[in-house]
Amino acid sequence: MSGPCPRFPFCGFDLKAEIVRIAAMEPNYSKLAGVLTGFSTNLQKGERVLIDAFDIPEAMVVALVRAAREQGAVPFVNLQRARVSRELVNGIDDEQFETQAAWELARMQKMDAYIAVRGSDNIFEMSDVDPRKVSRVMRAMKGVLDYRVNQTKWVILRWPTPAMAQQALMSTEGFEGFFFRVCTQDYGRMIEGMAALEKLMTATDRVELKGPNTDLRFSIKGIKAVACGGRHNIPDGEVFSCPVKDSVEGEITYNAPTVYQGTSFDNIHLKFEKGKIVHADGSNRGRLNEILNSDAGARYIGEFAIGFNPHILEPMRDILFDEKIAGSFHFTPGQAYEEADNGNRSQVHWDMVQILSLIHI
């Protein structure tokens, strides 16, 4: 070999071009890290923050560490890889479940804030894992999740990957540009604009949802509405509440695709009586009902939310984006949030999205 070659012909990878691309992206990394540490979690001097990094560039992790320190906070980092996680879950036993959950909870209890950035080269990485093991992991980790949601300042976002660009039917470069525009927009201004809807939903009793194969009626009386503008999710743009647990009657067909526990679902159709899902159909019907049978609360609704991010217009099989689609709502089987609580408890929290129905409140 006469010398180092920046191009590897066996895979078409251009090392020099990739270095240039990463260098060009670093200002975006710094800006996004500033949003997450400054606006979303509002880190203060001396606060401990856990940075959970799933399959994301090292440069973004470094940007988050630096941004946290600029806020005076103390950063801790947990690096995770999807293929490693899959292998661990595949062979896990009860003793390891308990040890892992206890260790994760002890660590979380030392934290004041939590930032998770989740990338994925393959959203179906867990699709061939025994569903019973996935459910067992979720049950074991529920205490960690509950503590993180209710006792820390937290924010979660996806990381733009070629796989996500494919889901969105966009080029990788085009999707990256879209991602950083959406994730670094002026969320303070968005919060101001949501106040009227939050007030209306807080004062509302009856809600009716009508659309193709959809006719739902329920009450949200006495349950708080919460405006979400970049504090917990990036991207953001929704106001959520929750139905009175036994008030939901009727049926709904979700017209946005959804991926949950590594399985893709389309055209989910649910029927309700006295708040409970009494019939569930759609693609992967067997797996759908397995999830809804995970526990008693999985067949009741834990969230009703209206989405309105003006930059997000089409579904892309990523719920952190899809639940914010302008003109959409999500109606979520499973766990209710404490901020808007109907008392439903479950290891499941499955945001399912419908676009462009008629909403009467």
Regions found by a protein language model. Name each.
Residues K16-R21:
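Short, positively charged and aromatic/hydrophobic N-terminal segments
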